[in-house]
Amino acid sequence: MAVSSAFVGCPKLETLLNHHNLSPSSSSSSSVSQTPLGLNGVRVLPKNNRTRRGLIQKARCELSASSDSASNAASISALEQLKNSAADRYTKERSSIVVIGLSIHTAPVEMREKLAIPEAEWPRAIAELCGLNHIEEAAVLSTCNRMEIYVLALSQHRGVKEVTEWMSKTSGIPVSEICQHRFLLYNKDATQHIFEVSAGLDSLVLGEGQILAQVKQVVKVGQGVNGFGRNISGLFKHAITVGKRVRTETNIASGAVSVSSAAVELALMKLPQSSNVSARMCVIGAGKMGKLVIKHLMAKGCTKVVVVNRSEERVSAIREEMPGIEIIYRPLDEMLACASEADVVFTSTASETPLFLKEHVENLPQASPEVGGLRHFVDISVPRNVGSCVGEVETARVYNVDDLKEVVAANKEDRMRKAMEAQTIITEESTQFEAWRDSLETVPTIKKLRAYAERIRVAELEKCMSKMGDDINKKTTRAVDDLSRGIVNRFLHGPMQHLRCDGSDSRTLSETLENMHALNRMYGLEKDILEEKLKAMAEQQQK
């Protein structure tokens, strides 16, 4: 049986067909003859096949291969093969939103830093993910506390497998190790998770505001990127709305600390109380995190800080914004010299390799006696800026983002109460988002119903014009054309009204979906919709 040209140049579709034995070569007469016939000439798969994972989850039936069907087999298109096969679930059923992630709650920083994807690489990652056989859309949320991949998957099981293997390939971490630390969430659970993340409920520091800015950045970077499609972009845009609403309508952000402020608190906890103000402070990196560290040091009474950065421009801007603290700029090549004169060194750069190693630190002079001669490195970067080997130096103490749990463990009861306030909003917004996704299902039917009516209109108009002859003037032609369009639009008005729904009312949505299925059956639109999905998949694969 020849495969339709619709599949040519679409490896993803060909892979689906071949993987699930849907290619012509897979349907040999010998395999058919070995399968016993059931009632009414229906061929039932053997019992041991009924429990097979993947596509065959329920007993499936195949029509017996009669001589008539065999003679007609060559005329069946590839589309009809797919519609009558197990692969139909990939195109007829709604795809799933899936989260494959590792966070500070499930994986150590040593693993997260290997998985981290710089923001500049997000578009490339989205393109690679959408090139996988069972992935339609994708987004990456990579921060110091989490590495999460959001996808729209044709198949949950196979999509997760492909993404996990991709993560292993890009990070060098074995699949088995990733599986030990990853978490998987599907559809409603995935929706609730990103809403909780955006609201600051899943952060190490409850209610911290930086994560909302990071979610916004996912949308900003994703705009115009093939693969950051309607479902995933809609999910993240709704998550931004949730994050704003939670912070506006609850007091979750009141008194909340950020990762940077927690880092300052941790450093002060480790210093003798008498030296909290006099300790010499150095901040490596003048980005958002570094700026917040300086801000919180000033709030704690620090009057002087040395800031090491690649350029002086950002440091000057911070100096103007914070006149209450003396900020001394030093270039990056003086980093070790600055560290040798500091008691506490905060690191917050985007460097993908450590800035401080054991050989850099072991020859530095001891910190001042006021802090016990110990130099404290507080590293809030992922990947880490301070190698774990620095902790082997007798006069050095190293802390990373995972150590901030010691700071935020306090006030647990207050954190839980604030989280409960936010959960009410998140539950409400999750329901609205799922309803919006449901309402999207009617869009293909609306398009195909209009196209169906337009084909009939054009065909009948051509018949009418041919009967009227060549001597018809332009005015009459235009009038007849307008008449045909008016009739079609009036005829479609009622069905279209019953197909449009914003998802805000569950009862209305249910009725809308019933109307959609009825119209699909009456006008045979499912085949057209399926063809459109196949075409979209082919185009996505070719990009």
Swiss-Prot record:
Quaternary assembly: Part of the FLU-containing chloroplast membrane complex composed of FLU, CRD1, PORB, PORC, CHLP and HEMA1. Interacts (via C-terminus) with FLU, only in the absence of light. Interacts with GLUTRBP and forms a heterotetramer of two GLUTRBP and two HEMA1 subunits. Interacts with CLPF.
Function: Catalyzes the NADPH-dependent reduction of glutamyl-tRNA(Glu) to glutamate 1-semialdehyde (GSA). Probably involved in the tetrapyrrole synthesis required for the chlorophyll biosynthesis.
Residue segments, region Disordered: 20-44
Pathways per UniProt: Porphyrin-containing compound metabolism; chlorophyll biosynthesis; Porphyrin-containing compound metabolism; protoporphyrin-IX biosynthesis; 5-aminolevulinate from L-glutamyl-tRNA(Glu): step 1/2
EC number(s) given by UniProt: 1.2.1.70
Activity regulation (UniProt): Negatively regulated by FLU and heme.
Gene3D superfamilies membership: Glutamyl-tRNA reductase, N-terminal domain, NAD(P)-binding Rossmann-like Domain
Keyword NADP: yes
PANTHER family recorded: GLUTAMYL-TRNA REDUCTASE 1, CHLOROPLASTIC (PTHR43120:SF1)
Name the record gives this protein: Glutamyl-tRNA reductase 1, chloroplastic
PROSITE patterns: GLUTR
Site note Important for activity, residues: 193
One of the Pfam families matching this protein, by short name: Shikimate_DH
Gene: HEMA1
Transit peptide as recorded in UniProt: 1-61
Binding site for NADP(+): 285-290
